[in-house]
């Protein structure tokens, strides 16, 4: 079994999963793996019963609505709903976790975190590292063409760098 090859495949699946998000600013996907099997996946989006609009305009800027549920939360909640445990699992995320998701990841017993792109804040990675969780940047070729930002989205976080969303 080629663990590195499998890890690259899981990250590509997380990247594909991110395409399910309706977010315009940042699409995030994740996959939870335990004993070499995918046990859950998730993407960022609105709670059940809400419309699929993840952003709102505030003072002429497009900002993420506070109700948006992060990919990590959705994947972990799906496990809990079905009576499964994430203890000892690995999570593959398109973007490194925010501090709130990092706290959830650590509390749920996930031992390995792999991320493709560093989120705008490194607080989550720093917390997980201090907490003894293995954190690894895993750069893989996306299984589909990524679209560079053309900065037409009001309030885009790329700051004109043309980063990929």
What function would you assign to each model-found segment?
Residues 1-165:
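Zinc-dependent deaminase catalytic domain
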């Amino acid at each position: 079994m080629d663990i590195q090859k499998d890890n690259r495949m899981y990250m590509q699946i997380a990247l594909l999963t991110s395409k399910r998000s309706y977010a315009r600013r940042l699409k995030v996907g994740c996959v939870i793996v335990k004993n070499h099997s995918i046990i859950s996946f998730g993407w960022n989006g609105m709670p059940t019963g809400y419309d699929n609009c993840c952003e709102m305009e505030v003072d002429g800027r497009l900002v993420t609505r506070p109700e948006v549920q992060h990919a990590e939360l959705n994947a972990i909640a799906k496990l809990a709903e079905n009576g499964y445990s994430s203890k000892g699992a690995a999570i593959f995320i398109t973007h490194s976790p925010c501090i709130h998701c990092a706290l959830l990841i650590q509390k749920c017993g996930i031992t390995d975190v792999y991320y493709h792109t560093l989120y705008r804040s490194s607080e989550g990675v720093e917390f997980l590292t201090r907490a003894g969780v293995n954190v690894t940047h895993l750069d893989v070729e996306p299984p589909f063409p990524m679209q560079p930002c053309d900065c037409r989205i009001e309030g885009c976080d790329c700051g004109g760098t043309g980063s990929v969303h």
